[in-house]
């Protein structure tokens, strides 16, 4: 986990050498998948391709910064359980009690760390392709709505939860 000069957390999810087959053989380039977050509810992801690794990472990071979205957090976890989907990938995200930690793998873990979630249970279903898992996770996170937002939509007063 590395922080840049703006206090953003940058995580490399996937770095691949890809080949384009041309008449004279194969032409290689690099593909990078990066997640950027502020550790306080904002997160974005980007993909970059270039002839050199640093350039691919730079492009991916720029795209990630441009596409950042806000995620509602409640005490370092999610407000409620959510299922995100993209392609064959499904990602189940469950809120967890304090001290649980981030129980997630690969791309899901990178997003959770970047967005600032400390306690969560996650399961990727259907695929382990980092691109689809990442997009499914982002779909789940962007579908989350805060209690304040929902109460405003419904024109109701927000009450304390019943125990």
Swiss-Prot record:
Belongs to the universal ribosomal protein uS5 family. PROSITE patterns: RIBOSOMAL_S5, S5_DSRBD. With S4 and S12 plays an important role in translational accuracy. Located at the back of the 30S subunit body where it stabilizes the conformation of the head with respect to the body. NCBIfam families: rpsE_bact (TIGR01021). Coiled coil: none annotated. Gene3D superfamilies: 3.30.160.20, 3.30.230.10. The gene is rpsE. PANTHER family: MITOCHONDRIAL RIBOSOMAL PROTEIN S5 (PTHR48277:SF1). Signal peptide: none annotated. This is Small ribosomal subunit protein uS5. Keywords: Ribonucleoprotein, Ribosomal protein, RNA-binding, rRNA-binding. GO terms for molecular function: rRNA binding; structural constituent of ribosome.
